[in-house]
């Protein structure tokens, strides 16, 4: 017998998702190749093959495989993989166009809170697609459109963290509190998710079969499934039943199994449709296909019915939440014989009666006319049994489990179709059936009392679960708000605020590598290298293999002139990953500290080869070119850094430095101001602007910049020194003396400070103090002896030496 085409592809898809979920990418790729060979024209096979190529790092192959369906927007999965490959390959416009053409397939999707250990959605939702679209626009230098995409993604899913990070990198102003707050949409989604969890866990109390309502037809081996959702009970109306369901019942191809949950499924396996609703295959190789279900075994002998030891149940599927159509006991089996017989070839694995008719389902929702439907049943219409007696599988119910269900039916109460079940079991439980019919009045009383108790318990559990879920979501939102606020402040170089926010986190969240690294970066941006080193040391101790932010750590060690630790860090990072740009930056900084600029340049070039978007690597190249006085090459390196990241202020600072050395003061001032616009709290950049203005004989404007720098960094020796010098040029000697006295206490061993004090006392005609400070400067810096001696010899001269030693 030739196997079903749909079942072969279904099994292959199930195996592919199994290996993907277990991170066995090579196995998944091989199986995806088999599926694509079996169904070369289907978009689903192309999507899975392209996805496996992408998981294996074969970006070009993923791009080629997904191009046919992805570039046209014919399949959402193909378009998504195609766009991801385009992002890596630099084909940004192609990826953007592909996502735009598939917009109708993802614009209404929202899978937030629909993923768990047992559920998955293998196709992306709107938030994921918008985030990818934002990355493509950002790489294409269309920052406004990128911001729109990131904002839309965060509105749908505030936990799309990389969308928030990229939004911060664009430099746009944000109100973080508006992102991480409990919106009505979030509240609704988390409440519904909590309700589903309750429905999947609540087990009705023991009692007659009428009280153990099983609204999910997929859990009843005798129920013919239907794909239509949210229909009401017919309560005996055969005409309404046929109006709602049509002349035939819609089931999966060949009747291999019940329908899957609307919102997700257990793994292994995955929804193969492009919508959230389950779809079935038509068997001709088109894109309409069933979810990957395992077919039930057929041709079991009649002896199986009498088995006392059924096979172990496969993993349970989540209930679908689809309300099944029901029949009442007033509907005769003979009235539907022709319809059931017409379904026989598709429901070949279902139980049949002795006469050969397909067994009708036991009624899941309707009871006797005298018994009203329970409120708890209406509220929770997806109860998943957890006992062995009534559990079954959504991946194809085996006969062993069916028999157990039948025996349970016989031992307990009977629904309104008890006559049908009696024929199915061929008399095995007729005695019990008679007993049940004799005790109808007792059944009614038991049903009523059990229904009230179940209703109260279910309602209380639902309220409790919803409350706990909302509280948990509020806690996570508050955590994300704090972390996001800290990162946003750091991206705006409000370093003190960032440190304060990160420090306010709970100890468990604060003492993590990522948070500690951000605090270290904040201290680094403030030029507080000793404090920054302390945090990076803790990061390295917690995560020895961490590469992120290690280029900053190596620069901190370079500033601290800690050659030994810098060399050790470089060796450690190379052992972790020789192909990481951070490792090569650390090696380059080590060579730079040893004044081996050529070797340092080679290392920094290697870093940018490994990652062409690594802006800091280009900036470090520029610094080395400046050290070698190769200014033209330095300009090219800094411009490459700006091209990689337009908000990388270090590259703008480098350009200003080069133009300053070349004597192009106007260009230098412009680039220093560009850098200060990005990082307005950096005192060094403000001092650079003041220095250029001072060289342009504009000491008043320079003094304004120096005052601003001293306000930003009160402990900055450089800012206070240049402020004192500007005051001396403006003949404000008393203010200059005040600044220098403070500076002397801050840096008592700085020769330039004592030299400037000597000059100031000379201007004040205080020769004693002038000689004292000149002598101190001479002792601290013997290399500047010539300058200091000339100043001491000119004590009696009225001419003022405007030069300093630096």
From Swiss-Prot:
Protein name as annotated: Protein bimA
Biased composition (Basic and acidic residues): 328-348, 432-445
Localization per Swiss-Prot or TrEMBL: Nucleus
Ranges of biased composition (kind: Low complexity): 246-257, 446-459
Species name: Emericella nidulans (strain FGSC A4 / ATCC 38163 / CBS 112.46 / NRRL 194 / M139) (Aspergillus nidulans)
Pfam family, one: TPR_1
One GO CC annotation: cytoplasm
Gene that this sequence comes from: bimA
Comp. bias (Polar residues): 224-237, 408-421
Native organism taxonomy: Eukaryota, Fungi, Dikarya, Ascomycota, Pezizomycotina
SMART domains: TPR (SM00028)
Repeat positions for TPR: 76-109, 127-160, 513-546, 581-614, 616-648, 649-682, 684-716, 751-784
